[in-house]
UniProtKB/Swiss-Prot annotation:
Keywords: Cytoplasm, Endonuclease, Hydrolase, Metal-binding, Nuclease, Ribosome biogenesis, rRNA processing, Zinc. One of its GO terms (cellular component) is cytoplasm. GO terms for molecular function: metalloendopeptidase activity; RNA endonuclease activity; zinc ion binding. Binds 1 zinc ion. Belongs to the endoribonuclease YbeY family. Disulfide bonds: none annotated. It comes from the Bacteria. This is Endoribonuclease YbeY. It holds the Pfam family YbeY. Gene3D superfamilies: Metalloproteases ('zincins'), catalytic domain.
Length: 147
């Protein structure tokens, strides 16, 4: 559950080569700039855990790249990111795993803020594109699906 003080990132089964401090700094930047200071927590874990969470909470029995869980409390909510999916997508799109995790984190935070690209007629796609440009991130999730 989101802590009231600040956003946190928990790493499970992450390789030693993963630049954890950069990911943690990016989470704090998202909290400040995108979420208007509202904290959120991020779990970076494996495909098996994302599949279990997706099955338990969304009734979809497959691993996905990012899940968002709004809190309804003082914090924004929680994100779960699949390290395996992030690694594969980073390779596929030609950028670093840290960049891919940042893209997934931004996408998840926009969902925590109440945006839903499946029903909002492009509003979340526009927001994601604007924030990616401001934050210096490569092509995002919604653009990949739309192209």
């Amino acid at each position: 559950m989101s802590s009231p003080e600040g956003s946190s990132v928990t790493f499970r089964r992450a390789p030693a080569t993963l630049r954890r401090p950069a990911i943690e700094r990016f989470a704090r930047r998202l909290q400040k700039e995108v979420a208007d200071g509202a904290p959120f927590d991020t779990l970076i874990t494996g495909d098996a855990e994302l599949r279990r969470l997706n099955r338990d909470f969304r009734k979809k029995d497959y691993a996905t790249d990012v899940l968002s869980f709004p809190s309804g409390g003082p914090g924004l909510g929680d994100l779960a990111i699949s390290l395996g999916r992030a690694r594969a997508q980073a390779r596929e799109f030609g950028h670093t795993i840290e960049q891919e995790i940042s893209i997934l984190m931004l996408h998840g935070v926009l969902h925590l803020l109440g945006h839903d690209h499946e029903v909002d007629r492009g509003r979340m796609a526009s927001l994601e594109k604007r924030w990616r440009a401001k934050l210096g991130l490569p092509t995002g999730l919604i653009e990949r699906v739309q192209s």
